[in-house]
Curated annotation (Swiss-Prot):
This is Terpene synthase 3. It catalyses: (2E,6E)-farnesyl diphosphate = germacrene D + diphosphate; (2E,6E)-farnesyl diphosphate = alpha-copaene + diphosphate. Mg(2+) 1 binds at D315, D319. Belongs to the terpene synthase family. Tpsa subfamily. Mg(2+) 3 binds at D458, E466.
Length: 561
C-alpha cells in the first residue's frame, strides 16, 4: 500500500523581464499550517504488526458469523457501515439488505409484516434499502401521519424514531413530499430536544443535525460514529474493537502516503517558484481521501491528489496572478499541449505549465500499458476546465457582471468537478473501462449535481471574502442582481439548489442506473467533502478552523484502544 512518486527534471527557461511593471493581485492566503509535519511518517513500516493483522482477522471472522445469523438485528449493519468497516463485508451485507428489501416490499403480506416494527426500525430499513440502491417506497411512513399528511405529534416523544426518520429523509428524490415533511418535522423537533439529551443519543443527534449520514464523508463519519458507538448501551464489542483497529491501521497508511506526498511537493518547488499559490497539500489529500478512501484505491488516490494539487495551482494562476495576455498565452499552450509552447510563456506561467506536463507524465508512469488511453481523457477534460477559468478572467478584466444563468453555465465547469471526477477514475482497476470514460467525459447528471453542490456551497460561505479580494461576482451577487432580492434570499435560493442536487444524486444511485455503483460513488464522495469543507466558511482557503480539526481527527490522532 502507498504511493510511488516519480520525479522528473524541472523544465527551466527564463524570459527577459518586462519593461513595464505589472501590478499583481494578492489574495493573502495564509501559509500552510502543517508544513513538513507528515515527513516524520516516511519511516513508518509499510506492513502493520502481525499481531494486529491476526486479531483483525479473528474479529472479521466473528462479524461474518453474526451477519449469517437469520435473527440479525439490522441495526448492527447500520453501525458496521457507520464505523467504516463495511468494506470488509460487502457481499454479506448486500445479501442481507436484499432480503430486507424483499420482505418489506415484494411479499404479498409486506404491509402486515411491517406492522411489527416501530418508527426507528421502519426508517432504518428504508434508509439502508435506499443506500443499497433499492427504490423503497415512502408509503411505509403513512401510518405515522395524520389525515392532513402531517406527522403525528406523538412521535416527537420517540427520539430514536425521529432521529432514524430524520436520517432517512436525506435519501429522498424529487417529488417525495412525505420525506420533505419528515425532514421539516424531525429537524425542528430534534433541535428543540437536543439540550435535554445526554450520552450517546445526544452525540448522535448533534452529529446528525450538523451533517446527516448521507452527506458526511466516510472517515469523518467513522471517527464520529466510533465515539458514539463506544458510549452506546448494548454496543457490540467485536464491531467496536474491529472499527478502532481498522481506523488506526488505515490512518497509518494514509500518514505514510502524506509523507511521500509532502516530499513530492517540496521537490516540485511550487512554494518557492509560485509563492502566490496556496500550499494546501494536507487539505487536498484529505479532500481526495474522502473520495477514494478504500485501501485498494492507493494508486487512484495518488493520481487524483496530484491532479487536485495541480488544479489548485492553476486556480491561483488564473484567479490571482496572471494578466489577461499571460492567461491567453497559457490557455492556448494548454490547448496545443506541446513542449515548444514553453518558449513562448513568461517565466512564472512556464513554471505552472511545466507542472501540468509533469503531472500528466506521472499519470502515464503509474498506469499499465493498456490503461494509458485514460490520460487522453484526462487531458480532454482539462481543456474546458481551463477555458472556464479563462472566461472568468476575461469577465474580471472587462468588469463584466454575468447573469446568473451565464454564471452557472461556466461555474459548473470552473468549479473543477467534471475534471476531478474523471481523474478520480484514472487510477481505478478494471472497473473503469473505456465506456466509463466515454460516459464521464460527457458530464453526466450525477457529476452536474456534485458540481452544483460544490459551486453553490463555495459561493454561499465564501462570496464575501471573494468580493473583498475583488473577484468576479459569485452566484450570490449574480442571483441578487437578476432577482432583485437580498443577499440572504439569494443564499437560501442557492441552498435550495444544493438540496435538489442531492436529490438528483440519490435518484442516480437507484438500481436502474447503467453505471457501476463503485463509479458513481466517486461523485458522491466529491459532494460529501463539500459538506465538510464548506459548511461554515471556505475551509480550503482558510483551513485553520473546522478543516484543521477534521484533518487532526482523521490523519493525526489515532483512536485510543
Amino acid at each position: 500500500m502507498g504511493f510511488s512518486f516519480v520525479t522528473n527534471a524541472a523544465i527551466a527557461a527564463h524570459m527577459p523581464p518586462s519593461k513595464q511593471e505589472i501590478i499583481r493581485r494578492d489574495a493573502k492566503f495564509h501559509p500552510t499550517i502543517w508544513g513538513d509535519h507528515f515527513i516524520q511518517y516516511l519511516d513508518t513500516p509499510i506492513d502493520p504488526p502481525q499481531k494486529v493483522v491476526e486479531r483483525m482477522e479473528e474479529l472479521k471472522k466473528q462479524v461474518r458469523a453474526m451477519l449469517r445469523d437469520t435473527n440479525l438485528d439490522i441495526s448492527l449493519i447500520d453501525w458496521i457501515q457507520r464505523t467504516g468497516i463495511a468494506y470488509h463485508f460487502e457481499e454479506q451485507i448486500a445479501e442481507t439488505l436484499k432480503h430486507v428489501y424483499e420482505a418489506s416490499t415484494l411479499t404479498t403480506d409486506s404491509s402486515k409484516y411491517l406492522e411489527h416494527f416501530d418508527l426507528r426500525h421502519i426508517a432504518l430499513r428504508f434508509r439502508l434499502s435506499r443506500q443499497q440502491g433499492y427504490h423503497a417506497s415512502t408509503d411505509v411512513f403513512k401510518r405515522f401521519m395524520d389525515e392532513g399528511d402531517k406527522f403525528k405529534q406523538s412521535i416527537a416523544n420517540d427520539i430514536e424514531g425521529m432521529l432514524s426518520l430524520y436520517e432517512a429523509s436525506f435519501m429522498s428524490v424529487k417529488g417525495e413530499a412525505i420525506l420533505d415533511e419528515a425532514l421539516a418535522f424531525t429537524g425542528k423537533n430534534l433541535e428543540a430536544t437536543l439540550p435535554n439529551l445526554t450520552g450517546s443519543l445526544a452525540q448522535q443527534v448533534e452529529c446528525a443535525l450538523e451533517i446527516p449520514l448521507r452527506r458526511c464523508t466516510d472517515l469523518v463519519k467513522a471517527r464520529r460514529s466510533i465515539s458514539c458507538y463506544e458510549n452506546k448501551n448494548g454496543r457490540n464489542e467485536v464491531v467496536l474493537e474491529l472499527a478502532k483497529l481498522d481506523f488506526n491501521l488505515l490512518q497509518a497508511v494514509h500518514q505514510r502516503e502524506l509523507a511521500l506526498l509532502t516530499s513530492w511537493w517540496n521537490e516540485l518547488g511550487a512554494s518557492t517558484n509560485l509563492p502566490f499559490t496556496r500550499n494546501r497539500v494536507v487539505e487536498l489529500y484529505f479532500w481526495v481521501l474522502e473520495v477514494l478512501s478504500k485501501p485498494e484505491h492507493a494508486r487512484a488516490r495518488e493520481i487524483m491528489v496530484k491532479s487536485i494539487i495541480m488544479a489548485s495551482i492553476l486556480d491561483d494562476v488564473y484567479d490571482v496572478y496572471g494578466t489577461l495576455e499571460e492567461l491567453q498565452l497559457f490557455t492556448s499552450a494548454l490547448e496545443r499541449w506541446d513542449l515548444q509552447a514553453l518558449e513562448q510563456l513568461p517565466n512564472t506561467i512556464k513554471t505552472a505549465y511545466s507542472i501540468v506536463l509533469r503531472v500528466f507524465k506521472e499519470y502515464e508512469d503509474l498506469l499499465k500499458p493498456h490503461e494509458v488511453y485514460r490520460v487522453g481523457f484526462a487531458r480532454k477534460a482539462l481543456i474546458p476546465y481551463m477555458n472556464a477559468y479563462f472566461l472568468e478572467a476575461k469577465w474580471f478584466y472587462s468588469h463584466h457582471h454575468p447573469s446568473f444563468e451565464e454564471y452557472m453555465d461556466n461555474a459548473l465547469v470552473s468549479c473543477g468537478y467534471p475534471f476531478l471526477f474523471l481523474v478520480s477514475l484514472v487510477g481505478l482497476d478494471e472497473i473503469a473501462t473505456k465506456d466509463v470514460f466515454e460516459w464521464a467525459i460527457k458530464r453526466p447528471n450525477i457529476v452536474v449535481a456534485a458540481s452544483m453542490i460544490c459551486r453553490n456551497r463555495d459561493d454561499i460561505v465564501g462570496h464575501k471574502e471573494e468580493q473583498e479580494r475583488g473577484d468576479v461576482p459569485s452566484g450570490v451577487e449574480c442571483y441578487t442582481k437578476d432577482h432583485g432580492c437580498t443577499e440572504e434570499e439569494a443564499c437560501m435560493a442557492l441552498q435550495a439548489m444544493v438540496d435538489d442536487a442531492w436529490k438528483d444524486i440519490n435518484c442516480e444511485l437507484l438500481h436502474d442506473t447503467s453505471m457501476p455503483k463503485a463509479i458513481l460513488m466517486r461523485a458522491v464522495g466529491l459532494a460529501r467533502i463539500i459538506s465538510i469543507l464548506y459548511q461554515y466558511r471556505d475551509g480550503y482557503s482558510d483551513s485553520t478552523h473546522e478543516t484543521k480539526a477534521h484533518v487532526t481527527q482523521v490523519l493525526v490522532q489515532p483512536i485510543p484502544l
